[in-house]
């Protein structure tokens, strides 16, 4: 499972990232990886975001910020999550994690897939 923390729905970088996950969803599935984007947005906001942008992955709401705090991604001063990626294996062990220096940047999908291949080797 790939947890992909993202700051907020309807922002330019987050929209581009969710669309990229949608475009490459089959590549993740072929690697037996479930992509789980997660943000502090409410469920209704994420549903609207998914419909408006034709996003093909289900997004998780961390509206109470509990998961973001546990994974250390919450930017307390902004009250939203930094962009981060956490790869969890079938046993629930975190195999890899990466947090961006700033929420305005993101890993390219090719980089994430390369990391998956490295871990699978």
Model-predicted regions and their roles:
Residues 1-121:
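Chalcogenol-based redox active-site neighborhoods
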């Amino acid at each position: 499972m790939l947890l992909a923390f993202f700051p907020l729905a309807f922002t330019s970088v987050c929209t581009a990232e969710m669309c990229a996950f949608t475009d490459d969803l089959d590549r993740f599935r072929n690697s037996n990886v479930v992509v789980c984007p997660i943000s502090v947005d409410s469920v209704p906001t994420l549903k609207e975001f998914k419909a408006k942008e034709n996003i093909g992955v289900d997004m998780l709401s961390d509206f109470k910020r509990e998961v973001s705090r546990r994974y250390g991604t919450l930017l307390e001063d902004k009250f939203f999550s930094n962009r981060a990626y956490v790869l969890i294996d079938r046993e629930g062990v975190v195999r890899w994690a990466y947090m961006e220096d700033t929420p305005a940047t993101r890993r390219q999908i090719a980089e994430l897939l390369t990391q998956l291949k490295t871990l699978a080797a």
